[in-house]
Amino acid sequence: MVKISFQPAVAGIKGDKADKASASAPAPASATEILLTPAREEQLPQHRSKRGSSVGGVCYLSMGMVVLLMGLVFASVYIYRYFFLAQLARDNFFRCGVLYEDSLSSQVRTQMELEEDVKIYLDENYERINVPVPQFGGGDPADIIHDFQRGLTAYHDISLDKCYVIELNTTIVLPPRNFWELLMNVKRGTYLPQTYIIQEEMVVTEHVSDKEALGSFIYHLCNGKDTYRLRRRATRRRINKRGAKNCNAIRHFENTFVVETLICGVV
C-alpha cells in the first residue's frame, strides 16, 4: 500500500500588515492523503509460489507413500516365500515308520519294521511315497504316487527300474487330507502304533506307450522307464515259494495298516 500526501495552496495576500503578519506565520493545514492499493497482478507471483510449493509437497508425499507400500509388498512376499512356504513344506513332509506283525512270510508271527518318506500335496490332491531298501527284507524299494485327480496309482520298482500303473484303490489308500491328519496326529512319536499287514495281488496286462495320458505326476515318475498296466486279481490265493519267484513285493502303508503289493507276471 502506497501513501501520498498534498499540501494546500495559499488563496491570497491581504494588504494590511495584520493580515500579512498572520499570513506570514505558517498556518496548520490538513494534508490530503491518497491511498493506492497495489494492482492484483503484483500479488499473483507470491500466491503462485505458495501453490507450487504445496503441489510439490503433495508429490513428494505421494512418492514416499508409494515407496513405502512397495517395501511392504516386497517384505510380505519375502516372508511368505522363505518362511510360510518353508513351514508348509515341512508340515507336508513326513519321515515315519511303523511296527507290524508279519504273518505272511512264515507261520510264526515276527515283528517287522517298515520305514518310508511321505510327501502330501493337498492342493494338487496327490501323495508321493518313497520306500527305501528294507533293513530286514520283505520287499523291494519303490516310489509310489497316488493321484486322486486321475484316480491312478503308479509303482516304480527301483530294483527293476520299471513302472506299473493301476486304478487307485480308495478302500486301502487314505485321501491326502485324511492321511495328512493321521500323520500329524502321530508326528510327536517316531513310529505309528503297532499294526498288521494285508496283501493284494496284481497281474501285469499290457505295455503303456502313452505316458502323458497318465497325468503329469505319474509321467514325471515313469518317463524313460518301461511302464505296464496292472489288473487287480479278484480272488486272493496263497502265494507259495514257487509262485513267488515270478512276483515282486512292495510293502508300504497309506493307512493304519501295512499293505504288501504283489506284482506278478513281471516282464
UniProtKB/Swiss-Prot annotation:
Annotated keywords: Cell membrane, Cleavage on pair of basic residues, Disulfide bond, Glycoprotein, Lysosome, Membrane, Phosphoprotein, Signal-anchor, Transmembrane, Transmembrane helix
Keyword Disulfide bond among record annotations: yes
Protein location: Lysosome membrane; Cell membrane
Post-translational modification: Type I membrane-bound, as well as soluble, furin has a pre-eminent role in ITM2C proteolytic processing. PCSK7 and PCSK5 may also be involved although to a lesser extent. The soluble form of PCSK7 is incapable of processing ITM2C. Fails to undergo shedding by ADAM10 and intramembrane cleavage by SPPL2B.
Record InterPro entries: BRICHOS_dom, ITM2
Disulfide bonds: 163-222
Residues bearing carbohydrate: 169
Modified residue annotations for Phosphothreonine: 37
Pfam family, one: BRICHOS
Gene3D superfamilies: 3.30.390.150
Transmembrane segments: 55-75
Residues spanning the signal sequence: none
Annotated ranges, domain BRICHOS: 136-230
General function of this protein: Negative regulator of amyloid-beta peptide production. May inhibit the processing of APP by blocking its access to alpha- and beta-secretase. Binding to the beta-secretase-cleaved APP C-terminal fragment is negligible, suggesting that ITM2C is a poor gamma-secretase cleavage inhibitor. May play a role in TNF-induced cell death and neuronal differentiation.
Family of the protein in this entry: Belongs to the ITM2 family.
Subunit structure: Interacts with BACE1. Interacts with APP. Interacts with STMN2.
Designated name of the protein: Integral membrane protein 2C
